[in-house]
Amino acid sequence: QTLVVDLGQNLAGIPSVTFSSNAEGKLTLTFGEMCNETGDAERGEDGAAGTVYRANYRSAQTQVQIAMQDRQKETYTSTFFYTGFRYLSITTTADVTLSHIQGISVGLDSPETGSFTCDNEKLQRLYENTKWSQRNNFAWIASDCPQRDERLGWTGDLAVYSRTSLYQQDLYAFYAKWSRDLLDAQKEDGAYPDTVPYTITTGSGNAGWADAGIFVPYYIYEKYGDKKLLAATYSSMQAYMDYLQKKSDFAGGQIGAEATFGDWLGLQVSDATFLSALWYGADAYCMEKTAAVLQKQTDVAKYQKLHKKIQNYIYRTYEIAERLERTVEKDFSQTELCMLLQYDLLQENDREKAQQMLLASVEKNEYRLVTGFVGTGLILRSLTDAGGAQSAYRLLLSEKKPSWLYSVDQGATTIWERPDSYTEESGFSKDEMNSFDHYNNGCAMQWIYESILGIRVDLAGEQPITIAPVLPDETVALTEAAGSYHSIYGEIKVGWKMNDRNIRKEVNKSVDIRKKDNSGNGETVTEAEFTIEIPAGQTALVALPIVGFEPRKLPGGIWKFAGVLEQ
């Protein structure tokens, strides 16, 4: 006899089962993230309908076997392992009474620092899914997934997600430990590994993965302002930059780290060698900022010069100016454009061309998510910087396949590894690398904090606290949001709500206040209310998108504003 239990949440943890039996026998527990629906192998299913799907666990065929005795009641709680699962399959060889079945979540016991609520249920679910995937993978190390025969600390995942993670939890101690592991794992030639802690089955010096050693320490400083950790890793960061310099050929060859992964799992093809060069430029960009924080002026000049040298190489080798002039979307992938824009690798007169090309590409792809590991963490901010905040909203809230919300529509309770981990048309992905609990694509939550709420805390900048929410237009199904971030200065809170109806001039018919009224009777407008809380003793630069509101510095306290939204 077999019973399959849906716990309702994909979690990393252990099972606890209370049972009683009047006979000796065996109770077997088997785990799965999904269930087989039809038993059709053509849909990637590995068992009969209703059984747990196990193929994506690969060789980690996690199973618990309990020898039952003739006794009234017994509780089994695993103590020797944990795994990722939502479904628990319980098979017995003798009659048994199950009185309690529980999945006990295991994760990092670190205080949550971020919160977010909104009136879009699917976006809210995506936010909760991200928090769950972070909890499930941030335990002893920052693992990629909690279920299969891997569970490694892939650096590429952290390179794109670490900024988001720092909004969600107080992770200073966690990342301090990670930084020590990083230094321990660094190769003698200066290359950073693909995984931290390092395992002999993985490589090193690969673009987009090794670069976590440059970016993560700086991101930690952004949020905590503690130079000690940054200073402790600085010589290691320099060693990696020296490694890149030694292996780079600026005279017509390749520059940067190894082009092994490219834009991993991206549906739009990117040139992996080009991305390696862009990552090298990004590293120089970040090292310049790091050196400035540590007041190493000679190094600031050194990395400024290197950044310019890389920019010149990229322009020459990849014909950047010529390709931008053609304004053909297929000349650059979205990820390539995002990296050029975010790491200041474009000449000033080319920035707008690249931004327009990015906006056109996203629109042409009908707001589907086509970026991979590298680009997904950059796309929303890049669109917003390009004046395309509404495009960013449409991309984030798209339910087309592939998209962030497609998995939510399929009942996901965590973030999926692949855009096609499961589809209604084809079933499960045929690729065995198919986790349903991977935090990397949850990097969109950074944009929720920084743009929807408008909270930015950057202790490396001139203004540590900025509050500048970006509100959606009438095409976006979102009219209310609120949230907070508990920074080292205290808790910062932002809430906004767009009124259902507010008409500047009296009209004779009912109108949608989020659209223009062309009847001649008057103009319809949207009015919004904002509530902002700034920690006591601190000052925040506040910019609100309401008519007549000039950006201003406000002291600690609770502030309320209302007004007509800018068009």
Language model: regions and residue ranges:
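Flexible glycine/proline-enriched surface loops and loop-helix/loop-strand junctions
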Residues: 72, 141-148, 158-159, 265, ...
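TPR repeat positional signature
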Residues: 217, 277, 284, 336-337, ...
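Extracellular/oxidizing-compartment recognition motifs
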Residues: 1-148, 156-157, 173-174, 194-198, ...
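Core register positions within helices of long alpha-helical scaffolds
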Residues: 216-219, 283-286, 290, 343, ...
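Hydrophobic, well-ordered secondary-structure elements that form the walls
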Residues: 226, 280, 340, 379, ...
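Active-site acid/base region of carbohydrate-active enzymes
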Residues: 87, 95-129, 135, 142-194, ...
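Extracellular polysaccharide-recognition and catalytic grooves
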Residues: 328-433
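Non-catalytic C-terminal accessory modules of carbohydrate-active enzymes
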Residues: 39, 390-567
